[in-house]
Amino acid sequence: MPRANEIKKGMAVNLNGKLLLVKDIDVQSPSARGASTLYKMRFTDIRSGMKVEERFKGDEIIDTISLSRRQVTFSYIDGDEYVFMDDEDYTPYNFKREQIEDELLFLPEGGIPGIQVLTMDGQILALELPQTVDMEIVETTPGIKGASASARTKPAAMSTGLIIQVPEYLSNGDKIRIHIPERRYMSRAD
């Protein structure tokens, strides 16, 4: 079994009888000598959908669970359910809107490549997005000529309702690359 310092985002763990999916990890290194590094992990309870937060020392042993990952493509919306199709055997995977509310902000019409469904023993657990997504700015203040030298930012809205900070020189219609885990602008898209 791995130690807390070996746990990565996207892994599933068994903690106090609960199945938890690691969503985020913050590493805190204390300044005192001899103090061990603390790992603050944010989880989503796979069964209930509740958010859970725990702290671990780097050498604590954590029980991990092996998950199956299937490559999928967004297919269609059926009422309040979103249907994703398996890329190999066309198995449909249904998610209620509440289950994937955060992920929907990064899913433009037509979907994006690199989406995976996490399953365990045939049970659908979660939807996992790639690290980056290319989206088009639909609403922002007009770009300022000559502003490329400054590091100032402004809010920009995407078609999905996502709002992030972008450099001042960008304007409506520009395609940008967004880093999904940090919800931040990376660069212009090709």
Swiss-Prot record:
> What SMART domains does the entry give?
EFP (SM01185), Elong-fact-P_C (SM00841)
Q: Name one GO cellular component term.
A: cytoplasm
Q: Which Pfam families match?
A: EFP (PF01132), EFP_N (PF08207), Elong-fact-P_C (PF09285)
Q: Which Gene3D superfamilies match?
A: 2.30.30.30, Nucleic acid-binding proteins (2.40.50.140)
InterPro entries per record: Elong-fact-P_C, NA-bd_OB-fold, Rib_uL2_dom2, Transl_elong_fac_P/YeiP, Transl_elong_KOW-like, Transl_elong_p-like_YeiP, Transl_elong_P/YeiP_cen, Transl_elong_P/YeiP_CS
Q: Name one GO biological process term.
A: peptide biosynthetic process
Q: List the disulfide bonds.
A: none
What GO molecular function terms would the record report?
A: translation elongation factor activity
- CDD domains found in the cross-reference section: S1_EF-P_repeat_1, S1_EF-P_repeat_2
NCBIfam families attached here? PRK00529.1, PRK04542.1, yeiP
Q: Which HAMAP family does the entry link to? A: EFP
**PANTHER family to which the protein is assigned, alphabetical:** ELONGATION FACTOR P, TRANSLATION ELONGATION FACTOR KOW-LIKE DOMAIN-CONTAINING PROTEIN
Q: Which family does it belong to?
A: Belongs to the elongation factor P family.
**What protein name applies here?**
Elongation factor P-like protein
